[in-house]
Amino acid sequence: SNAENRAYYVPVPANRDEALKIVNEFRPLYENENSMKVGQNIKYDMIVLQNYGVQVKGKLFDTMLAHYVLQPELRHNMDYLAEIYLRYRTIHIDELIGSRGKNQKSMRDLPPEDVYRYACEDADVTLKLKNVLEKELKKQSAEHLFYEIEMPLVPVLVNIESNGVRIDTE
């Protein structure tokens, strides 16, 4: 999503070679240092993209992390944040694929229109939350903590989770 109430969905096939072709079309956007990337748990998205050789660059804004900075004692999932800040009930993932367990479906099992609606809503709600939480960070004088301390740790954690950490046991 690049504007509120407007989002796009590009299906990525399971076949890695075909998926890589699509990911490479968007590589310049992800690796553009001059554009902000917004996500809900953006670390997860960065790890997925890193698996395709994409290094996300530029300023980052994670709505989950922003809310953690503002109210660490509360839940930070998108469904909760949308209800609290936007007064909006999102499409819950378990409504589409079922509860965790052996009978849970994959997103690939769903009709494309269901995935489209879910993915576009996810992107749009995330951007709307960013716009609200950004103001809250400013109001609570938490911008420095968020932008200068918390967000710079995200790429570090991506690398640690992807590559591991060497430990000198001696």
Positions of predicted regions on the chain:
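Active-site-proximal helix-loop-helix substrate-binding element of RNase H-like nuclease domains
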Residues: N2-K138, I149-L153, L157, S162
